[in-house]
Curated annotation (Swiss-Prot):
PROSITE patterns: PUR_PYR_PR_TRANSFER. 5-phospho-alpha-D-ribose 1-diphosphate binds at residues 27, 79-80, 106-107, 110, 112, 133-141. It holds the Pfam family Pribosyltran. GO terms for molecular function: magnesium ion binding; orotate phosphoribosyltransferase activity. CDD domains: PRTases_typeI (cd06223). Belongs to the purine/pyrimidine phosphoribosyltransferase family. PyrE subfamily. The keyword Glycosyltransferase applies. Catalyzes the transfer of a ribosyl phosphate group from 5-phosphoribose 1-diphosphate to orotate, leading to the formation of orotidine monophosphate (OMP). Gene3D superfamilies: 3.40.50.2020. The gene is pyrE. It catalyses: orotidine 5'-phosphate + diphosphate = orotate + 5-phospho-alpha-D-ribose 1-diphosphate. SUPFAM superfamilies: PRTase-like (SSF53271). This is Orotate phosphoribosyltransferase. The lineage of its organism: Bacteria, Bacillati, Actinomycetota, Actinomycetes, Bifidobacteriales.
Length: 231
């Protein structure tokens, strides 16, 4: 039986040292049994593979009519979203016969040369823009970038693709950040894998010495964490 996209992505996260199990304190103050470090994708091989995973998820979403095929540009918010947008656009072209642009924003507006807030494919009225980002915690980055996009041109944001959906409720409600963004902006938010899929996949994996990758303690803590914070 072929492994699912989520299973293969979990293997990739582990091989890249981007996924760690243990005891971590997040920015929110929550004690988490796992941590995802997007900074671990630090060479050409890893970022190319990551872009291919994003492209595969996008291709699946197009087949299921979740997002349209005629995407004009892939947008990644600075800074972490920049290599995601570039590598995803390359992978869509190379592996899925889709020629799309890439665009990202500057943290500070440039007032000379090409100028403005945006770099890459210029945004114009009517363009279909697909957002890519790593992990959503509260949706702050999306809420900051949507007004920037709309100020540039009357574009249509057709969706957002994340690497991982933490599936956690926010501090203010029992709704997850992903569901809150979908409700607020009206476009789908997809992920290559969600945290439950990651733990399900990891629970089936073994260390080189044959012992389970996830200890009984980690599995119990993961279940308790998702019971308390899961949405």
């Amino acid at each position: 039986m072929a492994e699912t996209l989520a299973h293969r992505f979990t293997e990739f996260l582990l091989e890249s040292n981007a996924l760690k199990f243990g005891d971590f304190t997040l920015k929110s103050g929550r004690k988490s049994p796992y941590f995802i470090n997007a900074g671990a994708f630090d060479d050409g091989k890893k970022i190319a593979a990551l872009g291919a995973f994003y492209a595969e998820k996008i291709s699946q979403a197009i087949v299921h009519n979740t997002i349209p095929r005629n995407i004009d540009t892939v947008f990644g918010p600075a800074y972490k979203g920049i290599p995601l947008a570039v590598s995803t656009a390359i992978a869509l072209t190379a592996g899925h016969n889709m020629t799309v642009g890439y665009t990202f924003d500057r943290k500070e507006k440039k007032d000379h040369g090409d100028g403005g807030w945006m770099v890459g494919t210029p945004l114009t009225d009517g363009m279909k823009v697909l957002l890519v980002d790593d992990v959503m915690t509260a949706g702050t980055a999306v809420r900051e970038v949507i007004p920037k996009l709309k100020a540039e041109a009357n574009v249509e944001v057709v969706g957002l693709v994340l690497s991982v959906d933490r599936m956690e409720k926010t501090k203010d409600s029992d709704m997850s950040a992903v569901k809150a963004v979908e409700a607020e902006f009206g476009f789908p938010v997809l992920s290559i894998a969600n945290v439950r899929e990651i733990f399900d996949a990891a629970a089936k994996m073994k260390n080189p010495d044959g012992t389970p990758l996830l200890s009984h303690d980690i599995q119990q803590r993961a279940a308790a964490y998702l019971e308390e914070y899961g949405a």
